[in-house]
């Protein structure tokens, strides 16, 4: 699985200066979480393709919110609770010729657990939603 290459890495969320690590539990949770299992169609495809941009998604995340741990099964892995951050990512839409026609932009929530070792670990990406007003063309990236 693509995510395994990130295990052990860390990124700083620029808006908060939080260091977020990629733990060994991310690949399994990302692929098989309750949220992932509910996804269909374009959102399922978006989550699968978003995996390759996780380092960048962490760096640009903002709007941090804290939530206490509510499930006993997470007492150890999220001893100090959870943080969620808003992030964005873009996926190309291709023409029949294979050229990129435009990019679809998605908004998502990064779910981060605050573990017993006092580190923050990315746990899952959730609430993926296409931003209907945000499309940009390939040439927008070069200007």
Residue positions per predicted region:
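Ribonuclease/tRNase effector modules and their secretory precursors
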Residues: 1-143
